[in-house]
Amino acid sequence: MMVKFLLLALVFGLAHVHAHDHPELQGQWKTTAIMADNIDKIETSGPLELFVREITCDEGCQKMKVTFYVKQNGQCSLTTVTGYKQEDGKTFKNQYEGENNYKLLKATSENLVFYDENVDRASRKTKLLYILGKGEALTHEQKERLTELATQKGIPAGNLRELAHEDTCPE
């Protein structure tokens, strides 16, 4: 994922969290929703429309591996990217559809919220929020919190893509 994901806002609060402080980070996850200021990046078959499956941390979470599917022409392709923790101790960086700098903003046993800034090969910057869960759709309250966070991050509130029921890639 990441991130593009990724990996991957804050649907549930605004405190920054550290990946190594959250053992619930690792494991099986599914993309619940994505928001982006450049909506074309997350539209159906868009380059940053990621269907996350798993997150693992190595070396004390200095490396975060995100396994996800991308879908092109109806075909799901499995991909794994590795993000490397940066000097600030919060941001991870990886190369996927350009350069990604992302942070875990919120972690619970049910959801993860990531903020990502992607700069593609044409130097176009995209701000994204990735919300991961266990396969459930967002509640009304979660959507409200997410749109508030998106606005704070410069992402239009209407640019929400809910993917919980659109994910047809293998488990």
Swiss-Prot record:
Subunit structure comment from the entry: May form a heterodimer with OBP1A.
GO MF annotation list: small molecule binding
- By what name is this protein known? Odorant-binding protein 1b
Q: What does this protein do?
A: Binds the chemical odorant 2-isobutyl-3-methoxypyrazine.
Q: One GO BP annotation here? A: sensory perception of smell
Question: What S-S linkages are listed for this chain?
Answer: 57-61, 76-169
**Domain of life per record:** Eukaryota
The family database entries (InterPro entries) matched by this protein are listed as: Calycin (IPR012674), Lipocalin (IPR002345), Lipocln_cytosolic_FA-bd_dom (IPR000566), OBP-like (IPR002448)
The record's keywords, sorted A to Z, are: Disulfide bond, Olfaction, Secreted, Sensory transduction, Signal, Transport
Q: What is its main location?
A: secreted
Which tissues is this chain's protein expressed in? Expressed in nasal mucosa (at protein level). Specifically detected in septal and lateral nasal glands.
Instruction: List the Gene3D superfamilies hit by this protein, alphabetically.
Output: 2.40.128.20
Regarding how it is modified after translation, the entry says:
The N-terminus may be blocked.
CDD domains for this protein? lipocalin_OBP-like (cd19427)
Repressor as UniProt keyword: no
GO CC term (a single one): extracellular region
Q: Where in the cell is it found?
A: Secreted
